[in-house]
Amino acid sequence: MLLDDLYEIVEPITADLGYILWGIEVVGSGKLTIRIFIDHENGVSVDDCQIVSKEISAVFDVEDPVSGKYILEVSSPGMNRQIFNIIQAQALVGFNVKAVTLAPVGSQTKFKGVLERVEGNNVILNLEDGKEISFDFDELKKLRVSPDFS
């Protein structure tokens, strides 16, 4: 699978450069956009993104993991970071999040609340209306931090 191949190539590069690979997202059809999100204990600057992008591009030129043309984007995950795995979810307990499910739960696919806790592969949200809901992480299309600026 393309995403697995990309993680296998990119993870050692980011680690060797001293960064944490936060996640990879592949979007589009035809000409793909490969988004690589990096983090660092001291934050991530534009220069950091350029350094990582240059290294990854050089390896992609040799390994050629993507057939055809693509756009490579390297950035910080930002304040409203996507949560790519259950370990990241565990570290973000207490944060406001937005969840989008793969299939409707009742009649809705979008939920907003506080990431209350993680139990095994389940994330439990305390919704804005005070109700609690649990999702298997694999049933989520997207889970993203949703900063509260009020």
Curated annotation (Swiss-Prot):
Q: Does the keyword Cytoplasm belong to this entry?
A: yes
Q: Which InterPro entries match?
A: Ribosome_maturation_RimP, RimP_C, RimP_C_sf, RimP_N, RimP_N_sf
Signal peptide positions are none
Principal cellular location given in the protein's record: cytoplasm
Enumerate the UniProt keywords alphabetically. Answer: Cytoplasm, Ribosome biogenesis
Q: Which domain of life is it from?
A: Bacteria
Name residues in a coiled coil.
none
Q: Name one GO cellular component term.
A: cytosol
Q: Does the keyword Lipoprotein apply?
A: no
Pfam families membership: DUF150_C, RimP_N
Q: Subcellular localization, per the record?
A: Cytoplasm
- One GO BP: translation
What's this protein's function? Required for maturation of 30S ribosomal subunits.
Q: Which family does it belong to?
A: Belongs to the RimP family.
The name this protein goes by in its record: Ribosome maturation factor RimP
Per the UniProt entry, what species is this protein from, by scientific name? Francisella tularensis subsp. holarctica (strain LVS)
